[in-house]
Regions:
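Short hydrophobic alpha-helical segments enriched in small aliphatic residues
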Residues: 11, 21, 29-31, 37
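Extreme N-terminal basic, low-complexity initiation segments
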Residues: 1-15
Length: 341
């Protein structure tokens, strides 16, 4: 009984106490007490394993709670960016109506500026945050593949990135980002960054004679799915302008303007370029959150599977521990009964 009290009061020294207690017992008691000592030793080990499993289960539950929070945030962001995309399309319609008025009297044979040399400026939209699956890898591979198909030599490519996470994937493809912009999700920050990007594109055109500007970004399809997309920003599409010129005005009132045609045209084109950049970023952000939502759904499923495994292990081990305790009680009862006899 003295040996048992020592064992129960200090589980960390279970084996040591049991061993020396066993050596100090009379030879006649060895066989009987050895069984009890082994029982207490294994019970102590079982308790340690149970505590470890319980900590693992608690950690998995905390991780599951975090994943659920991120899923909720991603869903809210997808909805918000979707509403912004709808508003931007209305804004684009207003720009088109303005251009429609300006280009009505421009002759169809009017010349459009053509690229002076085979140089390309690429704007690649990535993410600032992680945990969004293969979002950045997909757009990086898509951009490089399309630039190769355009047959633009690597030395004639100038790449600008939005989002730090995509840079490493571009470098893995053997390219370098000369211009890098970081951005935040709030509206004022996005507007400021887009103005800086537009200014940099104008510098490309004026100083480096880069007249071909292409945007690469992921755009949402439905739910948590998206696809990579390429938009040729410059030079402006001649057929698009001719289509606007031939388009029938919806209202009976004939529109007009008072300011200089060239100034108005330049202002509208700048608004169109800004809109295209802004829309690309918003659709990229919506796609990023769609990718993050899909990643969190997979993570939640994996966590739930892991939790089920841990719970089964915990319950089985707990049942084994209870069985051992019951067996010890039965053994003790039998020993006392035999002693009385």
């Amino acid at each position: 009984m003295e040996a048992r009290n020592i064992i129960l009061s200090d589980e960390s020294r279970t084996f040591e106490v049991c061993f020396y207690t066993f050596l100090s017992l009379p030879a006649s008691a060895h066989a009987k007490d050895k069984k009890h000592i082994n029982t207490y030793y294994y019970q102590g080990k079982k308790m340690e394993q149970l505590e470890m499993l319980k900590r693992k289960i608690d950690n998995e539950n905390e991780l599951k709670s975090l994943v659920r929070t991120m899923k909720t945030l991603a869903s809210v962001s997808i909805r918000e960016y979707g509403q912004m995309v709808g508003s931007l399309h209305e804004y684009h319609k207003a720009i088109e109506m303005g251009l429609e008025v300006v280009v009505k009297n421009i002759p169809e044979e009017a010349e459009f500026a053509q690229p002076k040399k085979n140089c390309l400026g690429a704007v690649i939209f990535g993410s600032e945050q992680g945990m969004c699956g293969r979002f950045n890898e997909i757009i990086a591979k898509f951009a490089i593949k399309n630039m190769d198909e355009l047959e633009i030599l690597k030395e004639n490519r100038t790449i600008m990135t939005l989002g730090d996470r995509v840079i490493s994937h571009i470098e893995e493809e053997g390219e370098t980002a000369e211009e890098r912009f970081s951005y935040h999700g709030n509206q004022s920050g996005v507007t400021q960054i887009m103005l800086q990007v537009l200014t940099k594109i104008e510098e490309w055109r004026m100083q480096s004679e880069i007249d071909q500007i292409v945007l690469f970004y992921n755009m949402p399809v439905s739910g948590s799915s998206y696809r990579p997309h390429m938009l040729r920003l410059l030079p402006l599409d001649r057929e698009w302008f001719q289509g606007l010129a031939r388009k029938k005005w919806e209202s009976r009132s004939i529109p007009t303007f008072t300011m200089d045609r060239d100034d108005l045209f330049s202002s509208l084109i700048r608004q169109y370029l800004f809109f295209s950049l802004y829309l690309a970023l918003i659709e990229s952000l919506a796609s990023e959150n769609a990718s993050r939502l899909a990643s969190m759904q997979k993570a939640e499923k994996n966590i739930e599977e892991r939790l089920n495994e841990l719970r089964i292990q915990y319950h089985n081990m707990r049942q084994d521990s209870i069985t051992m305790e019951l067996m010890d009680v039965v053994t003790g009862f039998e020993a006392l009964t035999n002693k009385k006899r």
